[in-house]
Protein backbone atom coordinates (compact mmCIF):
# COMPACT_ATOMS: atom_id res chain seq x y z
CA UNK A 1 0.00 0.00 0.00
CA UNK A 2 1.76 3.18 -1.16
CA UNK A 3 0.69 5.49 1.67
CA UNK A 4 2.37 8.86 2.26
CA UNK A 5 3.99 9.19 5.72
CA UNK A 6 1.14 11.33 7.08
CA UNK A 7 -1.51 8.70 6.24
CA UNK A 8 0.15 5.53 7.52
CA UNK A 9 -2.21 5.24 10.48
CA UNK A 10 -5.09 4.37 8.17
CA UNK A 11 -3.81 0.76 8.28
CA UNK A 12 -5.30 0.40 11.78
CA UNK A 13 -8.48 2.38 11.07
CA UNK A 14 -10.74 -0.66 10.67
CA UNK A 15 -8.55 -3.16 12.53
CA UNK A 16 -9.35 -3.02 16.28
CA UNK A 17 -6.83 -5.75 17.18
CA UNK A 18 -3.88 -3.97 15.65
CA UNK A 19 -5.15 -0.58 16.81
CA UNK A 20 -4.84 -1.96 20.34
CA UNK A 21 -1.39 -3.36 19.52
CA UNK A 22 0.05 -0.03 18.39
CA UNK A 23 -1.34 1.73 21.47
CA UNK A 24 0.24 -0.85 23.76
CA UNK A 25 3.53 -0.39 21.89
CA UNK A 26 3.21 3.38 22.37
CA UNK A 27 2.78 2.82 26.12
CA UNK A 28 5.88 0.60 26.05
CA UNK A 29 7.89 3.40 24.43
CA UNK A 30 6.65 6.03 26.91
CA UNK A 31 7.33 3.85 29.97
CA UNK A 32 10.68 2.73 28.52
CA UNK A 33 11.74 6.33 27.97
CA UNK A 34 10.72 7.30 31.51
CA UNK A 35 12.63 4.42 33.11
CA UNK A 36 15.71 4.90 30.95
CA UNK A 37 15.73 8.66 31.49
CA UNK A 38 15.46 8.12 35.25
CA UNK A 39 18.49 5.80 35.21
CA UNK A 40 20.47 8.29 33.11
CA UNK A 41 19.63 11.16 35.45
CA UNK A 42 20.56 9.07 38.49
CA UNK A 43 23.90 8.28 36.83
CA UNK A 44 24.78 11.98 36.42
CA UNK A 45 22.99 13.46 39.47
CA UNK A 46 25.12 14.77 42.33
CA UNK A 47 23.05 14.69 45.57
CA UNK A 48 25.82 16.12 47.77
CA UNK A 49 24.57 19.73 47.99
CA UNK A 50 20.75 20.03 48.00
CA UNK A 51 20.97 23.75 48.91
CA UNK A 52 23.31 25.25 46.28
CA UNK A 53 23.23 22.45 43.69
CA UNK A 54 19.67 21.04 43.81
CA UNK A 55 18.13 18.82 41.13
CA UNK A 56 16.72 21.75 39.16
CA UNK A 57 20.13 23.43 38.90
CA UNK A 58 21.50 20.16 37.50
CA UNK A 59 18.81 19.95 34.82
CA UNK A 60 17.02 16.92 36.23
CA UNK A 61 13.63 16.40 34.59
CA UNK A 62 12.10 13.12 35.81
CA UNK A 63 13.66 13.07 39.30
CA UNK A 64 11.49 16.05 40.44
CA UNK A 65 8.31 14.26 39.33
CA UNK A 66 9.24 11.11 41.26
CA UNK A 67 10.15 13.22 44.30
CA UNK A 68 6.88 15.17 44.41
CA UNK A 69 5.00 11.84 44.53
CA UNK A 70 6.95 10.64 47.56
CA UNK A 71 10.21 9.06 46.34
CA UNK A 72 13.19 10.44 48.29
CA UNK A 73 15.69 7.58 48.71
CA UNK A 74 18.23 5.95 46.41
CA UNK A 75 19.76 2.48 46.40
CA UNK A 76 23.04 4.42 46.24
CA UNK A 77 22.57 5.21 49.94
CA UNK A 78 21.64 8.89 49.63
CA UNK A 79 18.51 10.86 50.39
CA UNK A 80 17.25 13.80 48.33
CA UNK A 81 17.57 16.12 51.35
CA UNK A 82 21.29 15.40 51.59
CA UNK A 83 21.33 12.70 54.26
CA UNK A 84 22.50 9.08 54.07
CA UNK A 85 20.23 6.05 54.48
CA UNK A 86 20.75 2.34 55.01
CA UNK A 87 17.39 0.85 53.99
CA UNK A 88 15.87 2.71 51.01
CA UNK A 89 13.25 0.00 50.34
CA UNK A 90 11.96 -1.16 46.96
CA UNK A 91 10.36 2.17 46.02
CA UNK A 92 13.58 4.10 45.60
CA UNK A 93 14.43 6.17 42.51
CA UNK A 94 16.07 3.09 40.97
CA UNK A 95 13.10 0.92 41.97
CA UNK A 96 10.67 3.22 40.15
CA UNK A 97 12.96 3.33 37.10
CA UNK A 98 13.21 -0.47 37.08
CA UNK A 99 9.44 -0.86 37.41
CA UNK A 100 8.93 1.35 34.36
CA UNK A 101 11.45 -0.64 32.33
CA UNK A 102 9.90 -3.99 33.33
CA UNK A 103 6.44 -2.63 32.52
CA UNK A 104 7.77 -1.39 29.18
CA UNK A 105 9.07 -4.87 28.35
CA UNK A 106 5.74 -6.49 29.23
CA UNK A 107 3.88 -3.95 27.07
CA UNK A 108 6.32 -4.64 24.23
CA UNK A 109 5.51 -8.37 24.38
CA UNK A 110 1.76 -7.67 24.68
CA UNK A 111 1.92 -5.38 21.63
CA UNK A 112 3.58 -8.12 19.57
CA UNK A 113 0.99 -10.67 20.72
CA UNK A 114 -1.91 -8.39 19.79
CA UNK A 115 -0.31 -7.61 16.41
CA UNK A 116 -0.01 -11.32 15.59
CA UNK A 117 -3.38 -12.35 17.07
CA UNK A 118 -5.38 -9.41 15.77
CA UNK A 119 -8.54 -11.22 14.67
CA UNK A 120 -10.13 -11.90 18.07
CA UNK A 121 -13.81 -12.70 18.55
CA UNK A 122 -14.21 -9.83 21.00
CA UNK A 123 -13.54 -7.35 18.17
CA UNK A 124 -16.23 -8.63 15.81
CA UNK A 125 -19.95 -7.94 15.75
CA UNK A 126 -21.72 -11.28 16.37
CA UNK A 127 -24.57 -10.24 14.05
CA UNK A 128 -22.51 -9.22 11.01
CA UNK A 129 -19.17 -10.91 11.66
CA UNK A 130 -17.40 -7.65 10.76
CA UNK A 131 -14.87 -5.89 13.01
CA UNK A 132 -16.77 -3.60 15.34
CA UNK A 133 -16.25 -1.86 18.68
CA UNK A 134 -18.96 -0.74 21.09
CA UNK A 135 -17.34 2.65 21.62
CA UNK A 136 -19.83 4.10 24.17
CA UNK A 137 -19.39 0.97 26.31
CA UNK A 138 -15.58 1.16 26.03
CA UNK A 139 -15.80 4.85 27.00
CA UNK A 140 -17.77 3.90 30.11
CA UNK A 141 -15.22 1.23 31.09
CA UNK A 142 -12.27 3.59 30.68
CA UNK A 143 -14.00 6.43 32.52
CA UNK A 144 -14.84 4.11 35.42
CA UNK A 145 -11.26 2.79 35.67
CA UNK A 146 -9.75 6.29 35.37
CA UNK A 147 -12.12 7.51 38.09
CA UNK A 148 -11.12 4.59 40.30
CA UNK A 149 -7.41 5.38 39.86
CA UNK A 150 -8.03 9.10 40.46
CA UNK A 151 -10.05 8.44 43.62
CA UNK A 152 -7.49 5.94 44.90
CA UNK A 153 -4.62 8.38 44.37
CA UNK A 154 -6.40 11.17 46.25
CA UNK A 155 -7.87 9.06 49.04
CA UNK A 156 -4.90 6.78 49.73
CA UNK A 157 -1.59 7.96 48.22
CA UNK A 158 -1.88 11.71 48.89
CA UNK A 159 -3.47 11.37 52.35
CA UNK A 160 -0.89 8.83 53.48
CA UNK A 161 -3.63 6.30 54.27
CA UNK A 162 -1.80 3.84 52.02
CA UNK A 163 1.19 5.63 50.57
CA UNK A 164 3.80 8.25 51.41
CA UNK A 165 1.86 11.46 50.78
CA UNK A 166 3.30 14.17 48.49
CA UNK A 167 6.01 16.84 48.65
CA UNK A 168 4.87 19.77 50.80
CA UNK A 169 6.83 22.93 51.49
CA UNK A 170 6.52 26.42 52.95
CA UNK A 171 5.90 29.45 50.68
CA UNK A 172 9.65 30.13 50.43
CA UNK A 173 10.76 26.60 49.54
CA UNK A 174 12.89 26.04 52.65
CA UNK A 175 11.30 23.20 54.65
CA UNK A 176 10.08 20.85 51.90
CA UNK A 177 9.58 17.17 52.63
CA UNK A 178 7.23 14.31 51.76
CA UNK A 179 4.29 14.12 54.13
CA UNK A 180 0.63 13.00 54.20
CA UNK A 181 -1.89 15.68 53.25
CA UNK A 182 -5.42 16.04 54.59
CA UNK A 183 -8.09 16.91 51.99
CA UNK A 184 -9.15 20.57 52.00
CA UNK A 185 -12.93 20.61 51.55
CA UNK A 186 -13.44 24.33 52.16
CA UNK A 187 -12.86 27.24 49.83
CA UNK A 188 -9.11 27.00 50.60
CA UNK A 189 -9.06 23.81 48.51
CA UNK A 190 -9.36 25.99 45.41
CA UNK A 191 -6.16 27.88 46.24
CA UNK A 192 -3.56 26.49 43.78
CA UNK A 193 -0.88 26.73 46.48
CA UNK A 194 -2.73 24.64 49.10
CA UNK A 195 -1.63 20.96 48.95
CA UNK A 196 -4.91 19.82 50.55
CA UNK A 197 -6.66 20.72 47.30
CA UNK A 198 -4.68 17.99 45.52
CA UNK A 199 -6.25 15.35 47.77
CA UNK A 200 -9.79 16.74 47.77
CA UNK A 201 -9.90 17.40 44.03
CA UNK A 202 -8.68 13.88 43.20
CA UNK A 203 -11.27 12.38 45.54
CA UNK A 204 -14.06 14.55 44.07
CA UNK A 205 -13.01 14.10 40.43
CA UNK A 206 -12.51 10.36 40.98
CA UNK A 207 -15.98 10.00 42.49
CA UNK A 208 -17.46 11.89 39.55
CA UNK A 209 -15.51 9.70 37.11
CA UNK A 210 -16.72 6.49 38.76
CA UNK A 211 -20.35 7.65 38.67
CA UNK A 212 -20.04 8.91 35.08
CA UNK A 213 -18.42 5.64 34.04
CA UNK A 214 -21.25 3.61 35.56
CA UNK A 215 -23.75 5.92 33.85
CA UNK A 216 -22.19 5.36 30.43
CA UNK A 217 -22.09 1.60 31.05
CA UNK A 218 -25.76 1.42 31.95
CA UNK A 219 -27.33 4.06 29.66
CA UNK A 220 -27.09 3.95 25.87
CA UNK A 221 -26.76 7.26 24.00
CA UNK A 222 -29.88 8.43 22.10
CA UNK A 223 -29.82 7.52 18.41
CA UNK A 224 -29.82 11.13 17.20
CA UNK A 225 -26.93 12.02 19.51
CA UNK A 226 -25.07 8.85 18.53
CA UNK A 227 -25.37 9.72 14.85
CA UNK A 228 -24.89 13.47 15.29
CA UNK A 229 -21.59 13.08 17.16
CA UNK A 230 -20.53 10.08 15.00
CA UNK A 231 -20.13 7.89 18.10
CA UNK A 232 -19.63 4.81 15.96
CA UNK A 233 -16.54 6.25 14.27
CA UNK A 234 -13.11 5.57 15.78
CA UNK A 235 -11.91 8.98 14.56
CA UNK A 236 -14.40 10.55 16.98
CA UNK A 237 -12.50 8.78 19.76
CA UNK A 238 -9.23 10.15 18.39
CA UNK A 239 -10.59 13.69 18.20
CA UNK A 240 -12.05 13.77 21.71
CA UNK A 241 -8.95 12.09 23.18
CA UNK A 242 -6.72 14.73 21.59
CA UNK A 243 -9.02 17.39 23.11
CA UNK A 244 -8.56 15.89 26.59
CA UNK A 245 -4.78 15.76 26.15
CA UNK A 246 -4.32 19.30 24.81
CA UNK A 247 -6.57 20.71 27.53
CA UNK A 248 -4.51 18.94 30.21
CA UNK A 249 -1.28 20.15 28.55
CA UNK A 250 -2.44 23.78 28.63
CA UNK A 251 -3.44 23.44 32.30
CA UNK A 252 -0.13 21.94 33.44
CA UNK A 253 1.84 24.47 31.38
CA UNK A 254 0.06 27.14 33.44
CA UNK A 255 0.52 25.48 36.84
CA UNK A 256 4.21 24.92 36.06
CA UNK A 257 5.02 28.44 34.80
CA UNK A 258 3.00 30.39 37.38
CA UNK A 259 3.70 27.94 40.19
CA UNK A 260 1.41 25.82 42.36
CA UNK A 261 1.41 23.25 45.15
CA UNK A 262 2.08 20.56 42.53
CA UNK A 263 5.24 22.28 41.21
CA UNK A 264 7.31 23.03 44.35
CA UNK A 265 10.24 25.42 43.86
CA UNK A 266 12.58 23.02 45.69
CA UNK A 267 12.05 20.46 42.92
CA UNK A 268 11.55 22.61 39.80
CA UNK A 269 13.22 25.90 40.75
CA UNK A 270 11.61 29.30 41.38
CA UNK A 271 9.22 30.99 38.96
CA UNK A 272 10.10 34.15 37.04
CA UNK A 273 7.40 36.09 38.87
CA UNK A 274 9.18 35.56 42.18
CA UNK A 275 12.12 37.51 40.73
CA UNK A 276 9.88 40.12 39.08
CA UNK A 277 8.04 40.83 42.34
CA UNK A 278 11.09 40.71 44.61
CA UNK A 279 9.37 37.86 46.48
CA UNK A 280 12.45 36.41 48.19
CA UNK A 281 14.10 39.83 48.60
CA UNK A 282 11.11 41.05 50.63
CA UNK A 283 11.24 37.99 52.88
CA UNK A 284 14.99 38.42 53.40
CA UNK A 285 14.54 42.10 54.34
CA UNK A 286 11.65 41.16 56.64
CA UNK A 287 13.83 38.64 58.48
CA UNK A 288 16.74 41.08 58.73
CA UNK A 289 14.40 43.81 59.97
CA UNK A 290 13.04 41.44 62.63
CA UNK A 291 16.61 40.62 63.69
CA UNK A 292 17.58 44.29 63.94
CA UNK A 293 14.43 44.94 66.00
CA UNK A 294 15.76 42.36 68.48
CA UNK A 295 18.95 44.43 68.82
CA UNK A 296 21.03 42.14 66.63
CA UNK A 297 23.84 43.72 64.66
CA UNK A 298 23.72 43.93 60.85
CA UNK A 299 26.24 41.12 60.75
CA UNK A 300 24.24 38.87 63.08
CA UNK A 301 20.93 39.56 61.33
CA UNK A 302 22.29 38.83 57.85
CA UNK A 303 24.21 35.75 59.06
CA UNK A 304 20.90 34.16 60.10
CA UNK A 305 19.50 34.31 56.55
CA UNK A 306 19.40 30.71 55.21
CA UNK A 307 21.75 30.24 52.26
CA UNK A 308 18.88 28.46 50.49
CA UNK A 309 16.67 31.56 50.73
CA UNK A 310 19.47 33.83 49.52
CA UNK A 311 20.13 31.51 46.56
CA UNK A 312 16.52 31.75 45.38
CA UNK A 313 17.03 35.54 45.26
CA UNK A 314 19.51 35.31 42.37
CA UNK A 315 18.54 36.07 38.76
CA UNK A 316 20.46 33.04 37.45
CA UNK A 317 17.72 30.85 38.96
CA UNK A 318 14.99 32.70 37.05
CA UNK A 319 13.66 30.25 34.39
CA UNK A 320 12.89 33.12 32.00
CA UNK A 321 16.57 34.16 31.80
CA UNK A 322 17.59 31.10 29.78
CA UNK A 323 16.98 31.14 26.03
CA UNK A 324 14.55 28.50 24.76
CA UNK A 325 17.22 26.92 22.57
CA UNK A 326 20.18 27.04 24.96
CA UNK A 327 20.77 23.37 25.70
CA UNK A 328 22.03 22.17 29.05
CA UNK A 329 21.41 22.63 32.74
CA UNK A 330 21.67 25.84 34.73
CA UNK A 331 25.02 24.60 36.04
CA UNK A 332 26.28 24.57 32.44
CA UNK A 333 25.38 28.25 32.19
CA UNK A 334 26.57 30.40 35.08
CA UNK A 335 28.32 27.50 36.84
CA UNK A 336 27.92 25.47 40.02
CA UNK A 337 27.15 27.64 43.04
CA UNK A 338 29.82 27.16 45.70
CA UNK A 339 28.89 29.67 48.38
CA UNK A 340 27.10 32.91 49.28
CA UNK A 341 29.52 35.83 49.51
CA UNK A 342 27.12 37.76 51.72
CA UNK A 343 24.84 40.75 51.25
CA UNK A 344 26.58 43.90 49.99
CA UNK A 345 25.48 47.23 51.47
CA UNK A 346 26.67 50.28 49.57
CA UNK A 347 27.12 53.73 51.15
CA UNK A 348 28.13 57.10 49.77
CA UNK A 349 30.60 59.41 51.54
CA UNK A 350 27.73 61.04 53.43
CA UNK A 351 26.83 57.67 54.94
CA UNK A 352 23.56 57.16 53.03
CA UNK A 353 22.70 53.52 52.34
CA UNK A 354 22.39 52.90 48.59
CA UNK A 355 20.52 50.14 46.79
CA UNK A 356 21.51 48.75 43.38
CA UNK A 357 18.62 48.65 40.92
CA UNK A 358 18.06 45.05 39.93
CA UNK A 359 18.05 43.81 36.36
CA UNK A 360 14.55 43.10 34.99
CA UNK A 361 13.97 39.61 33.64
CA UNK A 362 14.13 40.32 29.92
CA UNK A 363 17.27 42.49 29.91
CA UNK A 364 20.66 41.06 28.96
CA UNK A 365 22.46 44.28 29.99
CA UNK A 366 21.27 46.97 32.35
CA UNK A 367 22.79 50.24 33.60
CA UNK A 368 24.32 50.10 37.08
CA UNK A 369 22.30 52.61 39.11
CA UNK A 370 22.40 53.09 42.89
CA UNK A 371 19.47 54.83 44.60
CA UNK A 372 18.86 55.89 48.18
CA UNK A 373 15.93 54.87 50.37
CA UNK A 374 13.70 57.47 48.68
CA UNK A 375 14.47 56.18 45.19
CA UNK A 376 16.68 59.16 44.28
CA UNK A 377 19.65 58.28 42.08
CA UNK A 378 22.85 58.91 44.04
CA UNK A 379 25.48 56.96 42.08
CA UNK A 380 26.00 55.03 38.87
CA UNK A 381 28.58 53.48 36.59
CA UNK A 382 28.43 55.97 33.69
CA UNK A 383 28.56 55.09 30.00
CA UNK A 384 30.63 58.23 29.28
CA UNK A 385 32.90 59.30 32.11
CA UNK A 386 33.43 62.78 30.64
CA UNK A 387 29.83 63.76 31.42
CA UNK A 388 29.38 61.82 34.64
CA UNK A 389 28.08 63.41 37.84
CA UNK A 390 27.28 60.33 39.90
CA UNK A 391 30.22 58.00 39.24
CA UNK A 392 31.40 55.74 42.06
CA UNK A 393 34.63 57.74 42.22
CA UNK A 394 32.86 61.12 42.43
CA UNK A 395 30.31 60.03 45.01
CA UNK A 396 32.83 58.02 47.05
CA UNK A 397 30.83 54.79 47.25
CA UNK A 398 32.02 52.00 49.57
CA UNK A 399 30.65 48.49 50.05
CA UNK A 400 30.50 46.27 53.13
CA UNK A 401 29.37 42.65 53.27
CA UNK A 402 27.12 41.15 55.93
CA UNK A 403 26.55 37.40 56.27
CA UNK A 404 28.08 34.82 53.93
CA UNK A 405 31.77 34.25 53.25
CA UNK A 406 32.77 37.95 53.19
CA UNK A 407 30.97 38.83 56.43
CA UNK A 408 32.46 42.04 57.85
CA UNK A 409 34.70 42.73 54.84
CA UNK A 410 34.53 46.21 53.29
CA UNK A 411 35.97 47.71 50.10
CA UNK A 412 36.49 51.32 49.13
CA UNK A 413 38.56 51.14 45.94
CA UNK A 414 36.26 52.08 43.02
CA UNK A 415 37.13 49.10 40.78
CA UNK A 416 36.09 46.56 43.43
CA UNK A 417 32.99 48.56 44.43
CA UNK A 418 31.87 48.69 40.78
CA UNK A 419 32.49 44.95 40.39
CA UNK A 420 30.18 44.13 43.27
CA UNK A 421 27.61 46.74 42.17
CA UNK A 422 27.39 44.99 38.79
CA UNK A 423 26.96 41.64 40.50
CA UNK A 424 24.35 43.05 42.89
CA UNK A 425 22.17 43.81 39.84
CA UNK A 426 21.70 40.05 39.61
CA UNK A 427 20.45 39.63 43.18
CA UNK A 428 22.39 38.04 46.01
CA UNK A 429 26.06 37.45 45.17
CA UNK A 430 27.35 33.89 44.91
CA UNK A 431 30.70 32.33 44.15
CA UNK A 432 30.20 30.18 41.04
CA UNK A 433 32.47 27.39 39.79
CA UNK A 434 32.56 27.63 35.99
CA UNK A 435 35.64 25.43 35.53
CA UNK A 436 34.25 22.00 36.50
CA UNK A 437 31.60 21.83 33.75
CA UNK A 438 33.31 24.34 31.43
CA UNK A 439 30.25 26.56 31.97
CA UNK A 440 30.00 29.35 29.40
CA UNK A 441 28.50 32.07 31.61
CA UNK A 442 25.27 32.32 29.59
CA UNK A 443 22.13 31.74 31.67
CA UNK A 444 20.10 28.56 31.12
CA UNK A 445 16.47 27.86 31.93
CA UNK A 446 15.38 25.38 34.59
CA UNK A 447 13.23 22.27 34.00
CA UNK A 448 10.29 24.58 34.83
CA UNK A 449 10.97 26.50 31.61
CA UNK A 450 11.49 23.39 29.46
CA UNK A 451 8.32 21.73 30.73
CA UNK A 452 6.24 24.85 30.12
CA UNK A 453 7.60 25.45 26.62
CA UNK A 454 7.20 21.79 25.63
CA UNK A 455 3.66 21.42 26.94
CA UNK A 456 2.44 24.77 25.61
CA UNK A 457 3.88 23.94 22.15
CA UNK A 458 2.41 20.45 21.99
CA UNK A 459 -0.92 21.70 23.37
CA UNK A 460 -1.12 24.12 20.45
CA UNK A 461 -0.29 21.37 17.95
CA UNK A 462 -2.80 19.01 19.56
CA UNK A 463 -5.44 21.73 19.50
CA UNK A 464 -5.12 21.87 15.72
CA UNK A 465 -5.12 18.05 15.66
CA UNK A 466 -8.42 18.05 17.55
CA UNK A 467 -9.96 20.52 15.07
CA UNK A 468 -8.62 18.48 12.13
CA UNK A 469 -9.84 15.06 13.26
CA UNK A 470 -13.06 16.45 14.73
CA UNK A 471 -14.01 18.06 11.43
CA UNK A 472 -12.98 14.92 9.53
CA UNK A 473 -15.28 12.71 11.59
CA UNK A 474 -18.23 15.17 11.73
CA UNK A 475 -18.13 15.97 8.01
CA UNK A 476 -16.92 12.64 6.68
CA UNK A 477 -19.88 12.36 4.33
CA UNK A 478 -19.18 15.82 2.91
CA UNK A 479 -15.48 15.11 2.38
CA UNK A 480 -16.04 11.62 0.91
CA UNK A 481 -19.22 12.39 -1.03
CA UNK A 482 -20.80 9.28 0.48
CA UNK A 483 -23.67 9.30 2.96
CA UNK A 484 -22.37 7.20 5.91
CA UNK A 485 -25.92 5.89 6.53
CA UNK A 486 -26.41 4.72 2.94
CA UNK A 487 -27.60 1.08 3.05
CA UNK A 488 -28.26 0.33 -0.61
CA UNK A 489 -25.57 -1.15 -2.86
CA UNK A 490 -24.26 1.53 -5.19
CA UNK A 491 -22.22 1.35 -8.34
CA UNK A 492 -19.34 3.80 -8.51
CA UNK A 493 -19.35 5.87 -11.72
CA UNK A 494 -22.97 5.11 -12.65
CA UNK A 495 -24.41 8.33 -11.26
CA UNK A 496 -23.43 11.99 -11.25
CA UNK A 497 -24.19 11.99 -7.51
CA UNK A 498 -23.31 8.70 -5.86
CA UNK A 499 -26.36 6.59 -4.98
CA UNK A 500 -28.89 9.05 -6.41
CA UNK A 501 -30.80 7.29 -9.28
CA UNK A 502 -32.37 10.60 -10.40
CA UNK A 503 -28.99 11.85 -11.65
CA UNK A 504 -27.94 8.89 -13.81
CA UNK A 505 -24.89 9.81 -15.82
CA UNK A 506 -25.51 10.82 -19.44
CA UNK A 507 -23.91 8.50 -21.95
CA UNK A 508 -21.95 10.63 -24.43
Curated annotation (Swiss-Prot):
- Name its cellular compartments: Plastid, Chloroplast thylakoid membrane
Membrane: is it a keyword of this entry? yes
The membrane-topology field of this record reads: Multi-pass membrane protein
Query: What GO terms describe the biological role, i.e. biological process, of this protein?
Result: photosynthetic electron transport in photosystem II
Q: Which Pfam families match?
A: PSII
Q: Does the keyword Cell wall biogenesis/degradation apply?
A: no
Q: What's this protein's family per the entry?
A: Belongs to the PsbB/PsbC family. PsbB subfamily.
Quaternary structure (record):
PSII is composed of 1 copy each of membrane proteins PsbA, PsbB, PsbC, PsbD, PsbE, PsbF, PsbH, PsbI, PsbJ, PsbK, PsbL, PsbM, PsbT, PsbX, PsbY, PsbZ, Psb30/Ycf12, at least 3 peripheral proteins of the oxygen-evolving complex and a large number of cofactors. It forms dimeric complexes.
As for what it does, the entry says:
One of the components of the core complex of photosystem II (PSII). It binds chlorophyll and helps catalyze the primary light-induced photochemical processes of PSII. PSII is a light-driven water:plastoquinone oxidoreductase, using light energy to abstract electrons from H(2)O, generating O(2) and a proton gradient subsequently used for ATP formation.
Give the PANTHER family listed for this entry: PHOTOSYSTEM II CP43 REACTION CENTER PROTEIN (PTHR33180), PHOTOSYSTEM II CP47 REACTION CENTER PROTEIN (PTHR33180:SF38)
Task: Tell me the NCBIfam families matching this sequence.
Answer: PS_II_CP47
Q: What is this protein called?
A: Photosystem II CP47 reaction center protein
Amino acid sequence: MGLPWYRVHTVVLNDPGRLLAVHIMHTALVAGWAGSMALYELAVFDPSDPVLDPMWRQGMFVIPFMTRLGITNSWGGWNITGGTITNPGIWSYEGVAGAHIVFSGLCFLAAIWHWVYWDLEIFSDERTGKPSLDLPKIFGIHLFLAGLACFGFGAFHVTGLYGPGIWVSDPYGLTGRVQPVNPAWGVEGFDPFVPGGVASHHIAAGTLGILAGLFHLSVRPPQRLYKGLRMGNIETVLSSSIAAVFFAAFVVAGTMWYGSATTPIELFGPTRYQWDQGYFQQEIYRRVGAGLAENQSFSEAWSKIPEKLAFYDYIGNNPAKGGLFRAGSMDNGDGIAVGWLGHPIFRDKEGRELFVRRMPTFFETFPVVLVDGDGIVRADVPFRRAESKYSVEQVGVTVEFYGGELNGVSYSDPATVKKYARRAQLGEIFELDRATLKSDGVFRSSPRGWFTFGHASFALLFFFGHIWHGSRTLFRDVFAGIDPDLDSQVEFGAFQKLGDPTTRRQVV
